[in-house]
């Protein structure tokens, strides 16, 4: 199939990824004189450069081995993509602390709070590269995953684990609002522990991996009611595993100090990757793996705007159309195949269209190169000293994230046979309900043609109100409370008002 003959939404998606390959390859470089390994972006970006390189390996691995398109019409070829993918994959393996290769110490990564996420991304890259990997590659990847699983075995007394939280770093603050939680951290620990167990069930540490897996599973999408839940789990009761709630009672998720839909997507992404790992191994999924997923998705889907974007009632702390929004793409693919969710299909089509439209504005195949060009210039200007210079890791991740998550969504559709039948759904009617989470001072309502919200606190510790209209940009509003008036005949018009009471709760 020629890339220009793409017809379906999934075909358009992967064709867009192929259009990115030449631009993305311009950021890839060998590591010094070592021509067998290379990385995406500068080594000075630290461990985030490893993550960006793992994503790059997946993208080129897919292009080299899996996609049904001919690349030659784009001036590319599979052999070249295979070489880049293997160099990137091996860079991630060889810089890990479990590897014996002597490389500069500052490049080493592993055994930290975020490294299980990268281990899972490497495992996914290994899936698409499977036929190109050597026995040494497979052994080194298995050793890396075992190392990360060992690093996440239970510590005594539920102590905080390294640098990125452990179950919950601290109890809720006195107001009852959580502010900081770690569902996504526990979820990617679940992934690496599960992958280690599935690959080596007879390993000497398998029983401790299993113990840690169950504990982390119980504390991913945990809610306050779990503290008294007597559901039997792996020989004990759920409340005995409960280390603290990571979601509010109505399934709102806070992170970075405010309601953060992006981390819902990141959490679900790790859980869904784990679900497919169990399926591929022919092993039954743990009963806790998808616990509370439908309830959490019922909140998340009411944030879907008409062009595929997410609303962020409390604000956002990442670049527009980047990071948390992009995690949504493979999440939507999984939801369609697992739950036959028609709203997920509706949202995916619109989000892909939004991303491709921006790519077409750029002449170099990039997704966000145009609007982030000034950022790149500041990063590469040696005369600009931090904190004036943006973090290189965020810029380079932003460049590789979009094609990666589009490619991963395609891969997950492909493993399920591409086509998914979902019943027609009245999207606006299904999502037309107000949502209130008093625990975190949040109220929002997605009506058929309007979205309005109020959140206290918000990003940068500020209260935020916003309103969006179908077909128009979603904009913050000045002031506090607003009346929401969904359109329609006067007799059927609903109206909801709110104001702040009791130290910031929305009533």
List the predicted regions and their residue ranges:
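Long, repeat-rich segments with strong aromatic
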Residues: 260-334
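Low-complexity, Ser/Thr/Pro/Gly-enriched N-terminal "stalk/linker" regions
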Residues: 1-102, 227-228
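Well-ordered mid-protein domain cores that form the structural environment of catalytic cofactors
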Residues: 88-164
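Extended polysaccharide-engagement surfaces of secreted carbohydrate-active enzymes
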Residues: 282-286, 306-311, 321-507
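An acidic intrinsically disordered interaction segment
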Residues: 8-26, 74-90, 210-243, 287-297, ...
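Well-ordered alpha-helical scaffold segments within catalytic/enzyme domains
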Residues: 2-7, 54-77, 117-137, 189-206, ...
């Amino acid at each position: 199939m020629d890339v220009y003959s793409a017809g379906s939404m999934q075909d358009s998606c992967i064709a867009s990824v192929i259009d990115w390959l030449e631009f993305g390859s311009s950021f890839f470089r060998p590591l010094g004189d070592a021509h067998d390994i290379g990385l995406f972006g500068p080594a000075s970006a630290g461990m985030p450069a490893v993550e960006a390189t793992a994503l790059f390996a997946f993208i080129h691995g897919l292009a080299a081995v899996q996609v049904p398109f001919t690349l030659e019409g784009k001036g590319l070829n599979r052999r070249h993509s295979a070489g880049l993918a293997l160099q990137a994959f091996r860079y991630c393996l060889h810089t890990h602390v479990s590897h014996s290769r002597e490389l500069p110490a500052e490049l080493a990564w592993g055994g930290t709070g975020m490294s299980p996420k990268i281990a899972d991304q490497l495992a996914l890259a290994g899936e698409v590269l499977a036929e190109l990997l050597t026995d040494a590659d497979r052994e080194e990847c298995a050793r890396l995953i075992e190392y990360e699983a060992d690093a996440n075995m239970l510590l005594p007394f539920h102590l905080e684990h390294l640098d990125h939280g452990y179950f919950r770093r601290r109890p809720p603050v006195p107001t009852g609002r959580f502010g900081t939680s770690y569902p996504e951290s526990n979820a990617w620990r679940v992934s690496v522990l599960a992958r280690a167990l599935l690959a080596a069930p007879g390993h000497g540490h398998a029983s401790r991996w299993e113990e840690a897996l169950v504990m982390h599973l119980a504390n991913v999408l945990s809610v306050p009611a779990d503290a008294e839940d007597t559901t039997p789990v792996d020989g004990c009761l759920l409340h005995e595993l409960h280390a603290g709630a990571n979601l509010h009672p109505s399934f709102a998720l806070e992170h970075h100090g405010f309601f953060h839909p992006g981390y819902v997507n990141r959490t679900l992404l790790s859980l869904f990757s784990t679900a497919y790992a169990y399926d591929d191994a022919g092993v039954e999924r743990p009963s806790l793996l998808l616990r509370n997923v439908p309830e959490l998705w019922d909140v998340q889907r009411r944030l879907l705007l008409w062009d595929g974007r997410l609303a962020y009632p409390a604000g956002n702390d990442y670049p527009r159309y980047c990071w948390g929004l992009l995690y949504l793409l493979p999440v939507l693919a999984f939801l369609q195949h697992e739950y036959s969710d028609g709203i997920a299909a509706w949202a995916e089509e619109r989000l892909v269209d939004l991303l491709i439209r921006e790519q077409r504005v750029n002449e170099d195949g990039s997704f966000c190169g145009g609007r982030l060009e000034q950022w790149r210039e500041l990063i590469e200007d040696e005369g600009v000293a931090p904190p004036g210079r943006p973090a290189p890791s965020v810029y380079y991740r932003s460049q590789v994230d979009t094609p990666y998550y589009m490619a991963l969504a395609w891969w997950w559709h492909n493993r399920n046979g591409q086509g998914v039948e979902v019943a027609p759904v009245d999207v606006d009617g299904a999502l037309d309900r107000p949502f209130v989470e008093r625990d975190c001072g949040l109220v929002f309502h997605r009506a058929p043609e309007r979205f309005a919200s109020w959140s206290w606190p918000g990003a940068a510790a500020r209260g935020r109100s916003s309103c969006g209209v179908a077909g128009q940009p979603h904009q913050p509003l000045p002031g506090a409370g607003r009346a929401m008036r969904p359109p329609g005949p006067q007799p059927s018009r609903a109206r909801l008002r709110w104001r702040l009471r009791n130290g910031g709760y929305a009533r």
